[in-house]
């Protein structure tokens, strides 16, 4: 029997709705990955509602929880770490310490850093210290990074002028250490208004993917968290990078189709679960 992969997901959690782990854990489980959720914050709801309650996890709790997993002899069974929204740079450093411990216990373990800073239409949501940490420290450790356009712009200190410029910016981030960069949401002058575009960039090649852009009265939150989680999960399940990239785009589109059909603000993950596991649509990544 083929072993089920195990993934430690260190990101935010909301009690109501879907963001961070609340957007990613169930879909990752649904496609066949055992997920160990470690919540960096626990909020009542995501912050686009403009009001919320809850608390940020103290940075020292992250190594303490990883110590607990090590104490029961399970740390070496962790195949990957996924990190998302950080409440502080100190939280980020605690995560990198945990990644180092896991890679020592399992040298094949992977680390995907989703450098959450905000959304091109919603603005930056983290302090400058977190942005600096992600670029100067996390990028050197991560196997994969999955920025959106706002985050890529922040890393580059400028906005792109074209698709080739987006590619150059992604390659500059790649040069800091990761094996692959997935740009989850491209935005550049001249981009078709009816398309949603993504990039996959490695040292050897790059691929561009376009899918239809779906209209919503209010853009759902958690799409980037869902994207990063599914991409890493498909890698753990045996996909190559391009296959994981294409699957992720299709599965996320299926969720958005269901969400749009229901007129929902929150992602319709439960209703779309079979289409997450077996997308009916397919989008081809074109090599650039």
Curated annotation (Swiss-Prot):
Q: Name one Pfam family in it.
A: Phos_pyr_kin
| Molecular function terms from GO | ATP binding; magnesium ion binding; pyridoxal kinase activity
Q: Does the keyword Nucleotide-binding apply?
A: yes
Protein name as catalogued: Pyridoxal kinase PdxY
Q: Give cofactor(s), names only.
A: Mg(2+)
Q: In which pathway does it act?
A: Cofactor metabolism; pyridoxal 5'-phosphate salvage; pyridoxal 5'-phosphate from pyridoxal: step 1/1
Source species: Pseudomonas syringae pv. tomato (strain ATCC BAA-871 / DC3000)
So what does this one do? Pyridoxal kinase involved in the salvage pathway of pyridoxal 5'-phosphate (PLP). Catalyzes the phosphorylation of pyridoxal to PLP.
Instruction: Name the GO terms of the biological process aspect.
Output: pyridoxal 5'-phosphate salvage
NCBIfam families, A to Z:
PRK05756.1 (NF004398), pyridox_kin (TIGR00687)
Quaternary structure, per UniProt, is: Homodimer.
Give a Gene Ontology cellular component term annotated to this protein. cytosol
Kindly list the positions annotated as binding substrate.
12, 47-48, 225
Q: What is its EC number?
A: 2.7.1.35
What are the record keywords, sorted? Answer: ATP-binding, Kinase, Magnesium, Nucleotide-binding, Transferase
The record's listing under SUPFAM superfamilies reads: Ribokinase-like
